[in-house]
Amino acid sequence: MIEEHGGIVQSDGSIQPIDMSSFEKKSGSKKKEKKLTPKNINLLVQQSNQSVKQQKDAQKKQTSNGFNNNNSSNIHDGGMGGGSSSDNMDGSLDYSINNILKKEYEKINRNQVSSFSDVENFSEDDEDDDAEDDDSSDDQVNNKKNKPKKPSKLMKHDSVDGKNKMTPISSTSKKKVQHQLKEKNKKKGIKNDKKKSKPTKPTPKSVSSLPPPKIDSSTNNDNGSSDDDNSAKFKKYLFSIEPQKFEHTIEIPPFREINEFYDQDDGYSILSKNKYIGNWRDHNQYKSFDFDEEIDNQLDDNIINNDNDNDNDNDDDNDNDNDNDNDNDNDNDDDENGEDNGEDLNINNNNNNYNNNNNNNNNNNNNNNNNNNNNNNNNNNNNNFTSIQNDLDLQNNLNLSPIIITSSSSSSSSSPIGRNEIKTSLVSESGRSISSPILIPSPTLSSKSNNQENDDPTLVKSNNSFIKSIFSSGKIKRNSLQEYSIRNS
């Protein structure tokens, strides 16, 4: 630990001063002043530890029995030469063990220093200073040998007076990048043609069609190449994913391509204030729906169709005229048998009474049929009312104004306007088809249309081609209305 006063705290608590002479700039030297970096601090701590150990080793040498400086070489070799006594043998053995431990400790410290330097990023000046420190001490010579060699700088060819001259390329120049690209292209056999256009990137596939990349787990992860390949594959997979659209996204309908609507504030035109806010109904412009007024007018004009008329014409009128072709004249040519004639007359009278009873029964049946027809007509009226009520409920739920599209050109003069010319089938969310007039949020069309036959803004007169163009172009989209169908009668 380095204190502010420049000392190293030892394990026993004592402070050893640091020799800062190597960090001071000498007079007359062109070298820069050294800086106290973490790497240099680590080296200083290592030097101090080694000096302390050397002192302890010297004390051990002095205190060891029979130790002599003259036979130090024999002790280094094996510790078996020199003294003949067992004490000398024990002392030399202890010294050899300490010497081996010392070498192992130095190796460990060297590895720690190298690993520490790999983690930290030092400038070139710091590396030069470290090299000078290594030259200053004998123990750091091995550290210098173990350092990895710097890669040779790329060279470029410059023709000077017809001779090629090699000059180093700076790391930040564009020529270095171009040189690297040329080398790669030479290996791949590709000519460096600047005029060539860049290849178009393939269109990314969707997530469903593109499987995730296979990561090779069999390769050794000690070498960084396999991890780099897997990460590159995974990055390529991520960037090739096309974002999927949400199923229930809100589609903004396009503005109407009719000049008449550009002045209207209906949410579709370019000049509209409510552009793209999704407002299908504006209470300031749209006429509210009145049940009493609108439905009465529609029923009078026979706009709402009822396919199930249930006329019940009752083709079997059951006239039962009972002409009684068997008039039973019975002229009774046999005048002599009067009794027989009387019996025949009685039989005929009975038959006539029977026929009269049948006629009365038939008349009663006809009355019952008429009552049934009246009931059917009442039911039809009720059905008409309920269908109108259902249409009103659907209309209120959708927040649509009741605009009824009819055709201005009628095929027959006797039929009322819009009768059996346009039929629509609206399908609700429950799947039940509802026969109803077409509802679209365009009340302003009637005010500017050429065919103004009625002042009612809810009644729109137009031709079938315009109606088909609206529904086929997708201008009207509703979640509850899943299907529109328009057909001529």
Swiss-Prot record:
Top-rank taxon, per record: Eukaryota
Biased composition, class Basic residues, residue ranges: 144-154, 173-199
Regions of compositional bias (Low complexity) in chain numbering: 43-53, 64-77, 344-389, 433-449
Composition-biased stretches (Basic and acidic residues): 155-164
Region described as Disordered: 1-94, 109-229, 300-389, 428-461
Acidic residues bias spans: 121-138, 308-343
Protein name per Swiss-Prot or TrEMBL: Putative uncharacterized protein DDB_G0287265
Organism: Dictyostelium discoideum
